[in-house]
Amino acid sequence: MRFSIFSTLLVSLATLSTAAELGIEKTHEVECTRKTVKGDTVQMHYKGTLQSDGSEFDSSYKRNSPLKFKVGSGMVIKGWDEGLLDMCIGEKRTLTIPPEYGYGSRGVGPIPGGATLIFETELVGIDGVSKDEL
């Protein structure tokens, strides 16, 4: 009986982890030799919407000002720290970010708790990387 309960628990946990996967879709691919790595300071343009109703909650395009941050340092949500690795300058991706990789159950501002987020992203630059390194 214990084995049966334990097996059921493992299957349930496996299902939960599958449901919480980060979605990464390359929408505009670019060839390069220098891709983003943890620790890079990057400039990203983005538009963020809620998966539930498509409402936009933020856009760097509207401000005409890309967001600058260090990848993998926790300055942004986990979905960005993981979903923006191995990108080339000029590449575009759509990230589908479950709550576990976003703002969790607490939400923030116009983003409700438990929200799955959709980000259309574009890598504009990597600090210290010149055009001839690409």
Curated annotation (Swiss-Prot):
InterPro entries: FKBP2/11 (IPR044609), PPIase_dom_sf (IPR046357), PPIase_FKBP_dom (IPR001179). The keyword Flavoprotein does not apply. The keyword Transmembrane does not apply. Its EC number is 5.2.1.8. Its main location: endoplasmic reticulum. GO terms for biological process: chaperone-mediated protein folding. GO terms for cellular component: endoplasmic reticulum. It is an enzyme of class 5 (isomerase). It holds the Pfam family FKBP_C. Keywords: Endoplasmic reticulum, Isomerase, Rotamase, Signal. GO terms for molecular function: peptidyl-prolyl cis-trans isomerase activity. It catalyses: [protein]-peptidylproline (omega=180) = [protein]-peptidylproline (omega=0). Inhibited by both FK506 and rapamycin. A motif (Prevents secretion from ER) lies at residues 131-134. Residues 39-127 form the PPIase FKBP-type domain. It comes from the Eukaryota. PPIases accelerate the folding of proteins. It catalyzes the cis-trans isomerization of proline imidic peptide bonds in oligopeptides. Belongs to the FKBP-type PPIase family. FKBP2 subfamily. This is FK506-binding protein 2. The gene is fpr2.
